[in-house]
Curated annotation (Swiss-Prot):
This is SsrA-binding protein. GO terms for biological process: trans-translation. Keywords: Cytoplasm, RNA-binding. Its main location: cytoplasm. The keyword Acyltransferase does not apply. It comes from Shewanella sp. (strain ANA-3).
Length: 163
């Protein structure tokens, strides 16, 4: 039996921070590993994670994710005290950390987690974005553009069914 050429599967998304794309304009995105405990991995496999109020900060040359809520399972761990909002260390190279530190300190950028996903089936990765907060008028422009795209698609569909 001949094996078919299998394309690399897209990473399975665990959670997305939808609010981040509305609140921030990202100029650069990068992938970071995350240091987790066993009960956290089990909870993530069950989909009990929330990134909505999450952000990344740098301290002593290391990156930490704050505000990521992982709800512990009742059966996950009986001998460890589970803290759902503990700090999670992000695993980045020294070069990446130095770059982030320079941009955050000098140019006022924010580091925000965008999504969490599985890499190669076993590794949890976090996509972080380096961006600046949007002003209110920027948010309104984005909303208008989104509504225009929906309206345009509706008109095109209507014209297609007529003709």
């Amino acid at each position: 039996m001949v094996k078919k050429n299998s394309k690399k599967a897209a990473p399975a998304t665990i959670a997305r921070n939808k609010r981040a794309t509305f609140e921030y304009r990202f100029e650069e995105k990068m992938e970071a590993g995350i240091s987790l405990m066993g009960w956290e991995v089990k909870s993530i496999r069950m989909g009990k994670v929330n990134l909505s109020d999450c952000y990344v900060f740098l301290k002593n040359g290391e990156a930490f994710m704050h505000g990521c809520t992982i709800i512990p399972l009742n059966t996950a761990s009986t001998h460890v005290v589970c803290d759902p909002i503990r700090l999670k260390k992000l695993l980045l190279s020294r070069k990446e950390l130095d770059k982030l530190a320079g941009l955050v300190e000098r140019q006022g950028y924010s580091i925000i987690p965008i999504s969490m996903y599985w890499r190669k089936g076993a590794w949890v990765k976090v996509e972080i974005g380096l961006g600046k907060g949007k002003k209110d008028h920027d948010k309104r422009e984005d909303t208008k553009a989104r509504e225009w795209e929906v309206e345009k698609a509706r008109v095109m569909k209507k014209e297609k069914t007529r003709g």
